[in-house]
Amino acid sequence: GEPSDIRARCAAGIMLCFDTDSPTLDLTGRILTGARTYAGFDVEVDGRVIEAHRIDTSPETRTLRLFDLPAGPTRRIVVTFPQSAIVELDALTLASGSKAAASASNRKRYLAIGDSITHGMDARGPSSAYAVQLARLLDMELLNVGVGGHIYDLEALDDDLPFKPDLVTIAYGTNDWSRGTSQAEIAATVKQYLTRLLESTAAAASVYVLTPIWRQNGDEAKPSGTLVEFSSAIATAASTFEAVR
C-alpha cells in the first residue's frame, strides 16, 4: 500500500459548516493525488445530501461548483472534503452580495482513532466513512485521526492534543494481526495504550474500543490465531479498564 505519510496527508473528516443565503459555492484550487487518483466532495443542505461530486485528481488549478440552488432563505451548508486526496485550496466563492457566517455550535466532541477503515478509505464518498456518520448521528464535532496501515502504537499518541473529546473510539487491530503480532504482545500493548490515553487525551471522555470485524483472509491460521481469536485478545485486554467499553 501507500506509505503512511501519504495517507496521513489525506485529512479525513474535514467539514466546512456555515449558514448562507448564497445560491452557489465555487471552490478553486488543486485536487492532488494522495492515496487515490480520485476525490469526492459531499454537500449537505439543511440536513440533506444534495450533491456527491466525484472527480479525478490533477495538479491543474480548477474551479468546481459545489452547489447551485434556487434563490431562497439562509440555509445551513455542510461540505465534507475528500479523504483520499490532497486539497490545495485557493478560494471559496459565494454569489455576489450574499452573506455567510460560521454555523453556531456548542456540540460535544468526538475523536476517532484508527486505521484505514476509520480514515474512510474506499468509502463511497467522504461522508460515508463511519466516523463521519457517527458524528452526524450523535450531532458531535469530529476529529478523525485515522490513518491507513496504522496499528496500536504508543509513539503515535499525542498527550498534548488540544482537541478535548467527550467521546473516543479506537479501532485498530487488523494491521497488527496481519503483521504477525502475537496475542500476548497485542494484549500488553493495548493495556499500555489505553492507560496512557486515559491519563491524557481521554481523561474526561467516554472511550470505546472497536475490535476488527472482518477482512478477506481473516480465517487464515497465523501464529497469533485467526482474526477473530486475535480480536478476542484485544477485547479481553480492554475489558480490564472500567472506563472503557
Language model features: what each stretch is:
Residues 1-110:
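N-terminal secretory targeting modules
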Residues 9, 22, 155-245:
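Alpha-helical cap/lid subdomain in secreted, periplasmic
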Residues 31-33, 116, 174, 213:
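Residue-level signal for short, function-critical loop segments
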Residues 40, 132, 235:
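Short glycine-/small-residue-rich flexible loop motifs, especially phosphate/cofactor-binding loops
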Residues 57, 117, 149-151, 214, ...:
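Residue-level detector of flexible, active-site-proximal loop/helix-junction positions
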Residues 70, 103, 135, 199-200, ...:
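Generic structural signal for beta-strand residues in well-ordered domains
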Residues 78-148, 153-164:
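Serine-esterase "nucleophile elbow" of acetyl-processing enzymes
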